[in-house]
């Protein structure tokens, strides 16, 4: 069945509508989180490994809990190296909100203290007040959305 000729698919006004609906959904059904960006204190110049970092800023942001694995279940595993917590959380954050409220402050950091100001980075921290838990960002979905 062909697309309806009464809608302009991909027009800027419809893209704006979809973005506004995403922001409203996050505001209504999301949770407040604290985003703690990592500042690099010391970097090994040979293999470019970050050897020391600090977290001295925090930004309040709304996020939607897309998938929660490990909450409410005994997911701590005793290994030969100690206790390993396997709690995971998948958060959905609006790119527009991040660009409006966090990116301008991240651009004020010196270039040697940050990795990227446009998106969150692996190694940054998320504080979830719902569970009083601190999570490290392990993966960022950097693909451009369809709209």
Model region roles, listed by residue range:
Residues 43-122, 127-133, 138-147:
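Short, conserved turn/kink motifs that form compact alpha/beta structural patches or helix kinks used as
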Residues 1-68, 75:
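Active-site-proximal polar cores
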